[in-house]
Amino acid sequence: MRKAFKLHSNFKPSGDQPEAIHQLKEGLKNGLMHQTLLGVTGSGKTFTVANVIADLNRPTMILAPNKTLAAQLYGEMKDFFPENAVEYFVSYYDYYQPEAYVPSSDTFIEKDAAVNEHIEQMRLSATKALLERQDVIVVASVSAIYGLGDPDLYLKMMLHLTKGMIIDQRAILARLSELQYSRNDQVFQRGTFRVRGENIDIFPAESSDFAVRIELFDDEVERLSLFAPLTGHIQKTVPRFTVYPKTHYVTPRARILQSMEEIKIELAQRREQLLANNKLVEEQRLTQRTQFDLEMMNELGYCSGIENYSRYLSGRAAGEPPPTLFDYLPSEGLLVIDESHVTIPQIGGMYKGDRSRKQTLVEYGFRLPSALDNRPMRFEEFESLAPQTIYISATPGPYELGKSAGELIEQVVRPTGLLDPVIEVRPVATQVDDLLSEIRQRVVIDERVLVTTLTKRMAEDLTEYLAEQGERVRYLHSDIDTVERVEIIRDLRLGEFDVLVGINLLREGLDMPEVSLVAILDADKEGFLRSERSLIQTIGRAARNLNGKAILYGDKITVSMKKAIDETERRRKKQESYNKEKGIVPKKLEKKIRDILELGQSYTKGKARKRTTTLEENSTNYTALSPKAIKKKIDELEQKMHDHAQNMEFEKAGQLRDEIQQLTLLLNAPQ
């Protein structure tokens, strides 16, 4: 097979990486369905996986436990494979309130959602790449197990255009409407088309940087060209082009009409059941809602909440799993599950929560029983669909260990020669004062500190106390959204503050080489936050620093603490022995802060890097402006910032806010 993946890197595998790469490749070639890579923090697990993908030449899906980690992996894979299709597939909701009913207060909550258009475009781009190419890496969140349009119907709906084909202009416009594209001759944006004489311009739903122009001569396609939507500049002419549907949920008209008949039959049966049980209100409610949906489907081809009829629209039998992203992954595909100790339980937990909410809606006449089949996959369905799988974690869970028959591929030695942190246990009685002393030692040498507490209240009190003592401290909690969380991590790395206090900092999983101390308060309180796995993960946050140290405050050493300390010590000894044998001197890890910055922006392919340099470039340009020109620029940027905020584009608004602050400083600076 032709080698499709081209790995770009300035580094060669080193440390434990070559052996890990070899073992993973051999296991996959020998048909092993499950392998577990135990890789410590900072050991280059992503680079190991990139080498395996490149050598085996297989389309790959990488599952991450949250959007933040998915974005980090996406950025790293884009750097490793700039010539290949690296795609991003996460939930496209910035905000999502599912439909629900609370019987105790007789409250019905309508579905409400805000869709992030850019992520929707990237999802469409991901499925297009899986259908068209072999060299694909899709980085996804647990969103991958939720229902998606049926790939067979999706393929049938595509509009294939070739130069010289005979097709009427009206026929093209009708097909575009079926694909849910809308005509807009004034504003040309993603998912729209416009007509100018005999030319039709289409802005593909999965594209962010090009549109296609169909030039007709009578009923013949004379020319197909790709052009820049903003400037209209022709980029190139092409012999053929395929227009993909605007959404994954598009359905042919014939299938919609057939589905409507099936829905009517189910409605009649359900009405009989409700009337037989004297549920008159529920029967009337269900009839009214379903008939309204049927009317909308007949007239427009879709309705609000059409996903609740997905069983009929995709032609599935009752109880069958929904089509998901896994149905788009080729049969020879590979699955990599990152932070598997978190991701696997997530996959298992999605179905039950969804089922219980929908069961109430069905029982009280808000939905037909078939709505229960609009659901995420069950765990056993996920297992049956998953291709050959590699689990990656510093602390693998019981599921992965069981599936791998207890055999682990270890990646403990870091290419940089860095050792696991030194661990000290200190008494609880003086933990806060001792911590303050340790923080001050780190601040002097420009290093950062992470502190993890057991409760929200304690985290708040500690943050307040440290601030009163003159320390630059921030508090990370569950109410902070993904983007702001990334910005806080970025500010910590930039030195905007020195100490970050949180409850469950281990879930971040972000690279913070500047952190040299992790302090775990009340480490001797057994429980979820102080389990062996949690302690190892938290200690690992200091593993990227040359002076990495972890202090566990506890009056006794619990079983979990002992296991975590012993495991860290075992790894440290192995690392020291390797360094001594090879003559390696541990090196400070240099990770550009730009890498983290890119995660906080909207995930625009190929453009994030340009955007992060904007502030620096502009500061140089602004110094040449007069005070009057600077004031005018501030007013202009403030207007844009408010517009972005109104459109819920908070990342862009935040970027402009930073620029305005810089201009204000420039304006107030002594001349």
Swiss-Prot record:
- One of the record's GO cellular component terms: excinuclease repair complex
Concerning InterPro entries, the annotation shows: Helicase/UvrB_N (IPR006935), Helicase_ATP-bd (IPR014001), Helicase_C-like (IPR001650), P-loop_NTPase (IPR027417), UVR_dom (IPR001943), UVR_dom_sf (IPR036876), UvrB (IPR004807), UvrB_inter (IPR041471)
GO-annotated molecular function: ATP binding; ATP hydrolysis activity; DNA binding; excinuclease ABC activity; helicase activity
Where does the record place it?
Cytoplasm
Q: Which GO terms describe its biological process?
A: nucleotide-excision repair; SOS response
* Domain Helicase ATP-binding, first and last residues per copy: 26-183
The lineage's top-level taxon is Bacteria
Per UniProt, the keywords (alphabetical) are:
ATP-binding, Cytoplasm, DNA damage, DNA excision, DNA repair, Excision nuclease, Helicase, Hydrolase, Nucleotide-binding, SOS response
Where does the chain bind ATP? 39-46
Give every UVR domain span: 631-666
Sequence motif Beta-hairpin, location on chain: 92-115
Positions of the Helicase C-terminal domain? 431-593
Instruction: State if ATP-binding is listed as a keyword.
Output: yes
Q: How are the domains described in the entry?
A: The beta-hairpin motif is involved in DNA binding.
Describe the subunit structure.
Forms a heterotetramer with UvrA during the search for lesions. Interacts with UvrC in an incision complex.
- Record's family? Belongs to the UvrB family.
Q: What does this protein do?
A: The UvrABC repair system catalyzes the recognition and processing of DNA lesions. A damage recognition complex composed of 2 UvrA and 2 UvrB subunits scans DNA for abnormalities. Upon binding of the UvrA(2)B(2) complex to a putative damaged site, the DNA wraps around one UvrB monomer. DNA wrap is dependent on ATP binding by UvrB and probably causes local melting of the DNA helix, facilitating insertion of UvrB beta-hairpin between the DNA strands. Then UvrB probes one DNA strand for the presence of a lesion.
Q: What is this protein called in UniProt?
A: UvrABC system protein B
Q: Which source organism does the UniProt entry give?
A: Hamiltonella defensa subsp. Acyrthosiphon pisum (strain 5AT)
